[in-house]
Amino acid sequence: MSHFFAHLSRLKLINRWPLMRNVRTENVSEHSLQVAFVAHALAIIKNRKFNGNLNADRIALLAMYHDASEVITGDLPTPIKYYNPQIAHEYKKIEKVAQQKLIEMLPEELQHDFRCLLDEHYYSEEEKALVKQADALCAYLKCLEELSAGNNEFIQAKVRLEKTLAMRQSPEMDYFMEVFVPSFSLSLDEISLDSLD
């Protein structure tokens, strides 16, 4: 018997942004799906508009599993995780152990197929960068949603994430920011009006 998917199903029980007041709580499972949507889009944008040659389907899968180890480690708040290089390095080692534990839960004949999704060492540098871009973009989108709902708790997180996005800047991310991100600050009525015309 394998407990792999029973563990993954518990990602929905792990809340993100645990030290901040949230208008709407976000869990790791739904965050992972949004990161998969965005990473897939970034890969397609890169391929179509900027001469990329990425496997967008694989990128979506990598993004889907990018936080899977948090079912074992929990979601450590970013300011703690990256407080200094030593803590960040040690936390990476903890994540690696958690990834390995998850892989070992699988039947042996399936381990290789999932190892290349769960273990970042199997990602190309380009794949890794794109998933990290999508992850940061989704955190930024969460900030926009919270701020548009009147929650000023996310002001500093938004500023921090703008710096992160600037460091990870790419043509495909610029395109996504210009074409898709403005809608995240609008109400349902505002985004529905355009689609009904």
Swiss-Prot record:
Binding-site residues for substrate, renumbered to this chain: 16-17, 31, 67, 75-78, 135
Cellular component, GO annotation: cytoplasm
Domain HD: 28-140
Entry keyword set: Cytoplasm, Hydrolase, Metal-binding, Nucleotide-binding
SMART domains linked: HDc
Catalytic activity: a 2'-deoxyribonucleoside 5'-phosphate + H2O = a 2'-deoxyribonucleoside + phosphate
The keyword Cytoplasm belongs to this UniProt entry's keyword annotation: yes
Highest rank taxon of the organism: Bacteria
InterPro entries: HD/PDEase_dom, HD_domain, YfbR, YfbR/HDDC2
Positions that bind a divalent metal cation: 31, 66-67, 135
Enzyme nomenclature, EC number: 3.1.3.89
Function: Catalyzes the strictly specific dephosphorylation of 2'-deoxyribonucleoside 5'-monophosphates.
Name under which the protein is recorded: 5'-deoxynucleotidase YE1340
